[in-house]
């Protein structure tokens, strides 16, 4: 069992631009101390390479099934007719079906330690909302979740799970907050940016509440490094490529940062390249601008320097709702800017076709978000020479994404198999 998280800040090849306040209005940086547990603020700005995992958090990790397995996708290799070795780290075995529980448990623990009685958050497809709902229940906290309206209407199974864990869930934009009322209309699909603003506003409107972010913040990526640290111990051979999907960056950072950090220090993984895969509906790394922007739609939180499509950008509804975010974590953005991370974007039709191929050859139904990595692996398997090694993070299963697979089966009548 991993006993410490890895912090990429200690090994970054450039200076990570700090958060800053806008020119007008109250200090957003000071606001962080009101909405976040104090330990998380310390972790956000620390330059220490290793951060000890509290024993209480490690115990929950054990109970929910860590370490998760790393598997050879031999059936997928045969289906592709490739001699490339393909491995995947499978986070879908966790109770909520995704990697999101890794940081939800840590954040709920720190919120409880700070005296909170309730936590609030945003969620897209519902994986993060499920994780916070369960983590809150495990630590005796109330949970309130603002779920993007398009997913609230289409991902009903995850909505049921959140409520089963004891959470209160609102469709966002909602009529609960001023932010929600400003954007509200029944057919508005919502966005993670709006949902973040609603969750923060909700926390500020009550007592003993804390906000738990699902991505973008550096401490979220820190907690997720349990994935990559485990994978480094489990891999039988050094990969040529490490691949993961990107919404805000926690999945990609959690999986790749331990390997990338070792490469930057000259301690292994010298040949490994790192590929971030995003949705064509929210292509911040491939089409966004590298600049300061708000991580939320309303501008409640501090400005951070990142690749962004603009905080007012509302991505079109797609099945991979967890990737419908306008920006990427500052550390990931810097690494992409400096050329240490590659990026590619795919449309959902070719992604879901790849997901079906993986399901039929491996028996694992990928979450639509994770399927973006599967699509990229197909490309790499055709591009790389025989004997090359590719590893990717299967960040979650798609057993609660029936709507996405129903549509994929319709698309299959048109599309055969993903092409280069």
From Swiss-Prot:
List of residues that carry N6-(pyridoxal phosphate)lysine: 100
Alphabetized GO MF terms: L-serine hydro-lyase (adding indole, L-tryptophan-forming) activity; pyridoxal phosphate binding; tryptophan synthase activity
One Gene Ontology term, aspect cellular component: cytoplasm
Keyword Magnesium: no
Family matches, as Pfam families: PALP
Reaction it catalyzes: (1S,2R)-1-C-(indol-3-yl)glycerol 3-phosphate + L-serine = D-glyceraldehyde 3-phosphate + L-tryptophan + H2O
Class of enzymatic activity (EC top level): lyase
Signal peptide: none
Complex formation: Tetramer of two alpha and two beta chains.
Family, per entry: Belongs to the TrpB family.
Database matches in HAMAP family: Trp_synth_beta
Protein name: Tryptophan synthase beta chain
Organism: Pyrobaculum islandicum (strain DSM 4184 / JCM 9189 / GEO3)
